[in-house]
Design a protein with these regions (language model features):
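Self-processing/autoproteolytic domain segments and adjacent N-terminal interaction modules in large
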Residues: 1-37, 42-49, 54-56, 72-208, ...
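Beta-strand-rich extracellular passenger or scaffold domains
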Residues: 59-63
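Residue-level detector of buried hydrophobic side-chain packing
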Residues: 80, 185, 210-211, 244, ...
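Short proline/glycine- and polar residue-rich coil/turn motifs
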Residues: 177, 227-230, 306-310
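Proteolytic cleavage junctions
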Residues: 199-207, 213-273
């Protein structure tokens, strides 16, 4: 059988799709409503908009097929589980998830297609624990899953870089990317799931970073991070699939080469702050100083792998493989930077990542 939904379709029981469930015009909404467990199975389902309202506690929906959402998903009430049921929920390029909360989220992986920014409506064990990605330079497929589990059972928490004081031992996120394209990743902390040794330091500058488990060298790596206490989040740039979580840093030692970023840039030719100035007095300490700058949407506007050499400095103009026009002057505003460099530690070469804000004035 064939069913095309361009209107409002409400389903109150189990769904077994044995034919075509699709749409012609992007006007329809598929509503799943009830007070008992609803299974979603059979052939894949395509819908423009998606609405959940089921008062069943714990799991309200079990997704056993593939669900494609093209516009809006409204998580009004009811947890949708696909962690064990094996289904897939795909958000297409312009799709967005609304109202996710502890009573309504996806317990399992969520896939985002395209290049738009997105907040993943994910969680586990009755807690909504989102992750966010920025706008991308080109289309990608990125999947995110949250685990309310100690990562140490699989990824040794004692194997870590020296600047990492203590790793979140109650939760982690798995991020899988089809293409190794850089994106800004935002993770959140929550008093119900995040350990107190992290919560107690969220207002301390440079105390909370995102860390990544490097499967090749079997060690946790510091990926840096900029905290936002209004949103209970920390953000940094990533380009690898894998396991990420929060960590408390040795914040009194978090700048191993004493790199200083003067974050005001006013390229007006007066000789003061015409370019982004980065003080690297211990040049023998920091090597291969890589600098990336992103606008407020997470689009990369500048990149160099050897800042300061051969005139490679940020002067308010975009450069690199970007989605904004190359070598065009950027508008005034606040930008986000990520520095990465190599430095010597007792047992060999280490890599450090630092993040922060730049204030650009081109008026």
């Amino acid at each position: 059988s064939t069913f095309y939904n361009d209107g409002r379709t409400s389903l109150y029981g189990h769904i077994l799709n044995e034919g075509t469930f699709d749409f012609y015009n992007q006007t329809g909404v598929l509503r799943l409503v009830g007070n008992q467990l609803q299974d979603i199975s059979g052939q894949e389902i395509f819908t423009t908009n998606f609405y959940l309202e089921n008062s069943t506690s714990q799991v309200a929906f079990q997704l056993k097929t593939t669900l494609h959402i093209y516009r809006d998903a409204d998580f009004n009430l009811g947890i949708l589980e696909n962690r064990l049921s094996g289904g897939t929920i795909n958000f297409l390029d312009e799709a967005w998830a609304y109202q996710a909360n502890n009573l309504s989220f996806v317990d399992g992986p969520v896939v985002k297609f395209g290049d738009h920014n997105f907040i993943y409506p994910i969680g586990h064990q009755n807690y909504y624990r989102p992750a966010g990605i920025s706008m991308l330079a080109s289309e990608n497929i990125i999947e995110a899953t949250y685990f309310l589990e100690n990562p140490g059972g699989l990824y040794d928490l004692q194997q870590k870089e020296g600047l990492i004081e203590r790793i979140d031992d109650r939760e982690y996120w798995q991020i899988d990317m089809e293409n190794r394209e850089e994106t800004m990743l935002s993770l959140t902390w929550n008093s119900n799931t995040t350990p107190n040794y992290i919560l107690n330091q969220t207002s301390t500058a440079d105390a909370i970073h995102i860390v990544y488990w490097n499967p090749i060298i079997q060690r946790w790596e510091d990926k840096g991070g900029l905290t936002n206490t209004d949103e209970n989040s920390v953000t940094t740039a990533i380009k690898r699939s894998g396991i990420y979580t929060l960590a408390l840093m040795k914040y009194d030692e978090v700048n191993p080469c004493e790199i200083v970023v003067f974050n005001a840039v006013t390229p007006n030719g007066d000789g003061f702050n015409d370019v982004l100035e980065i003080s690297n007095e211990e040049a023998s300490c920091a090597r291969n100083l890589e600098v990336k700058i992103f606008n407020r949407w997470g689009v990369k506007v500048f990149e160099t792998d050897n800042y300061g050499a051969s005139g490679q400095v940020f002067d308010g103009y975009s450069s690199g493989r970007l989605t904004v026009q190359e070598q065009s002057q950027l508008p005034s505003g606040t930008y986000f930077y990520v520095l990465e460099y190599d430095y010597e530690q007792g047992d060999g070469l280490r890599k450090h990542q630092k993040a922060g804000y730049i204030h650009l004035s081109t008026d």
